[in-house]
Amino acid sequence: IDIDNSINSGQVFLWEKQGVDWYGINGQDILKIDKNGMIKSIRNRKINFFRKDDDIEEIIKSISKDKIVKKAVKEYEGLRIFKQDPFQCMISFIISSNSNIQKIKSSLEKITRKFGTKVKIEGKEFFVFPKPEKIAKASIDQIKTCGVGYRASFIKEAAQMVVLKKIDFEYLKKCDYQEAKKNICRIPGIGNKVADCIMLFSLN
């Protein structure tokens, strides 16, 4: 697995390299990847962030029927799709609409600092991603201070839908592609591309 390329590919935004190690926020957890590519959860949770159960050879064989994809697979060997926290992933890609990686990263960092909980590990301070309830209760003006502009109302409504179980990530993981997409596209601010990103990066 090419860790650096995978982290910098635009799937995740709340990761930073400190020395030779990567630290990343994944929902209510902090993940650490060392120089050998070993990953651990600071909360000692069982994680499958690298999707090690996937049959990579079979997936590559299947998608390489397309010539452009085949060339990309060869050029970016070692690139992997991560399995992210669904709520964090959803908010990240609502913010991603009409934006760029630096702006997305900046807004998400502000959201975690404003609404998340501070944790200390290995002498370092981090903020875990806020729970849906925290964002659902925030005012649109409070969310706007995080640099998300017109997306503030989308973020609040998305969080409210999760709290009210109108969006149930565990249910969506069991749905087929069309059914999951239909459900996710009910959230304001989510169209085809954003829905596909959320499904690919967090809902299997």
Feature map (PLM): residue ranges:
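HhH-family (HhH-GPD) DNA N-glycosylase catalytic core used in base-excision repair
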Residues: I1-N204
